[in-house]
Regions:
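Transmembrane alpha-helical cores of Major Facilitator Superfamily
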Residues: 1, 85-89, 170-178
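Transmembrane alpha-helix termini and helix-breaking/packing motifs in multi-pass membrane transporters
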Residues: 2-15, 182-197
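Symmetry-related core transmembrane helices of the 12-TM Major Facilitator Superfamily/SLC fold
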Residues: 14-34, 198-220
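Flexible interhelical linker loops that connect adjacent transmembrane helices
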Residues: 27-61, 225-228
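Extracytoplasmic gate region of multi-pass secondary transporters
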Residues: 53-92
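Transmembrane alpha-helices of Major Facilitator/SLC transporters
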Residues: 83-107, 111-119
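C-terminal transmembrane helical hairpin of 12-TM major facilitator-type secondary transporters
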Residues: 106-152
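A late C-terminal transmembrane helix in Major Facilitator Superfamily
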Residues: 160-195
Length: 228
């Protein structure tokens, strides 16, 4: 996706299309090498959500959409390689903190920290989007993304009943990609946002709504349905 956003400045469109097709071919080849040790259910109907969407985890999944939507909007409005690396650096720091502390055991605090850090990064980006401030913003957004997405994934893995975790993880991946691609499409199209500043303001709004929705509904839903 990042290559697609920044590729036209490096390669002509036809070569980008050939590159995309080649990567799709590599993906298809690698998929054929995957061996699944479980037998698929027999006598399934023509249309089925089995192994595709788990409705029990849909509410946390919809709440989780705020994370990839914000990330997609920001990446579409800020085509800077060092900014992307700063986001990756923030996420790596989250992984280290997760191993060294017990903060991951408190989901409510984890999501709160994640959204607040993301908000801080967006505000910095809104005020100054160049120089050291840009890298600090990317680091905060990456760190906040790690905190938020870490707990949302944990919820979607713990909520399923027996033998449903694969479907739940598939739901997580589907919603993550849907949110990211939708955010890119909306931000790049120009139908909703005409300037980068408007994109950042929209991302701030999405972040606030995601935090409030978690505190008011998702956290309570998880406590009521966990291990039922």
């Amino acid at each position: 996706m990042l290559i697609g956003l920044n590729g036209p400045s490096m390669l002509p469109i036809p070569k980008l299309l050939y590159l995309s097709s080649a990567l799709c071919g590599c993906s298809a080849f690698l998929i054929t090498m995957v061996q699944v040790c479980f037998r698929a259910p027999l006598d399934l109907p023509l249309c089925s959500f089995d192994r595709f969407i788990l409705f029990r985890t849909l509410l946390p999944g919809l709440n989780m959409l705020c994370v990839p939507i914000v990330l997609g909007m920001v990446l579409s409005a800020m085509p800077d390689a060092l900014f992307y690396l700063s986001i990756v650096g923030g996420f790596i720091v989250y992984l280290l903190l997760r191993q060294l502390s017990s903060i991951s055991q408190n989901g409510k605090l984890q999501v709160f920290l994640g959204q607040v850090l993301t908000l801080a990064g967006l505000v910095v980006l809104l005020v100054v989007d160049s120089g050291a401030h840009l890298h600090a913003s990317g680091f905060l957004i990456g760190l906040g993304t790690g905190f938020s997405i870490g707990h949302f994934l944990q919820m979607m893995i713990l909520l399923p009943m027996h033998c449903e975790r694969g479907t739940s993880y598939q739901t997580f991946q589907l919603l993550w990609q849907l949110g990211f691609v939708a955010a890119l499409a909306i931000a790049v199209s120009g139908f909703v946002f005409s300037t980068s500043r408007e994109v950042y303001e929209g991302a701030i709004l999405v972040c606030i709504v995601g935090l409030l929705f978690y505190q008011l509904y998702t956290c309570r839903y998880f406590k009521e349905h966990y291990q039922q």
